[in-house]
Amino acid sequence: MMATYEGCYTDAQALRIAVVVARFNDLVTGKLLSGCLDCLARHGVDTSSNSEQLDVAWVPGAFELPIVTQTLALSGQYQVVITLGAVIRGDTPHFDVVVAEASKGIASVSRETGVPVIFGVLTTDTMQQALERAGIKSNLGWSYGLQALEMGSLMAVLRSATSAS
């Protein structure tokens, strides 16, 4: 019989979550974090300042997201890590380098550790586009929080199913 595995958004109390936020472009990343925390709180995650369920780490920029994400994932304390950043195109190739290295680094953390890592790094041509994605039109931070809940839950289901067989 074919098995179907899905995560859910309702079992958030069982998850311990880390959020790694890039300080560069903090006008945008702060809004992403607010949206993310709002989503998590509305789904039952304790987001208070004395939470035992959630930790937030700030890094200088998107380029530094992978190493801190990897450190947190390897700690064994978290079932899912969310990365938040905003890289906005400028007049030099710096944008391409930062985006490529941050995305490759973040993806490798998930593969190497088995901990789901949510890629919440906006890559836009303008500040206006970034702000539209962080709250003016919608807040993708909310979506990243929802993805974290689903992936954390799905991984628990998969681990339970594979250990039972």
Curated annotation (Swiss-Prot):
A Gene Ontology term for the protein's cellular component: riboflavin synthase complex
One example of a Gene Ontology biological process annotation: riboflavin biosynthetic process
Annotated keywords: Riboflavin biosynthesis, Transferase
Segments crossing the lipid bilayer: none
Catalysed conversion reaction: (2S)-2-hydroxy-3-oxobutyl phosphate + 5-amino-6-(D-ribitylamino)uracil = 6,7-dimethyl-8-(1-D-ribityl)lumazine + phosphate + 2 H2O + H(+)
Entry-linked CDD domains: Lumazine_synthase-I (cd09209)
Residues given in the record as 5-amino-6-(D-ribitylamino)uracil binding sites: F24, A62, F63, E64, A86, V87, I88, F119
Molecular functions per Gene Ontology: 6,7-dimethyl-8-ribityllumazine synthase activity
Family in the record: Belongs to the DMRL synthase family.
Organism: Prochlorococcus marinus (strain MIT 9313)
Superkingdom of origin: Bacteria
Listed name of the protein: 6,7-dimethyl-8-ribityllumazine synthase
Function, as annotated: Catalyzes the formation of 6,7-dimethyl-8-ribityllumazine by condensation of 5-amino-6-(D-ribitylamino)uracil with 3,4-dihydroxy-2-butanone 4-phosphate. This is the penultimate step in the biosynthesis of riboflavin.
InterPro entries xrefs: LS, LS/RS, LS/RS_sf
Catalytic site positions: H94
E.C. numbers: 2.5.1.78
Pathway terms, separated by semicolons: Cofactor biosynthesis; riboflavin biosynthesis; riboflavin from 2-hydroxy-3-oxobutyl phosphate and 5-amino-6-(D-ribitylamino)uracil: step 1/2
Binding, (2S)-2-hydroxy-3-oxobutyl phosphate: D91, T92, R133
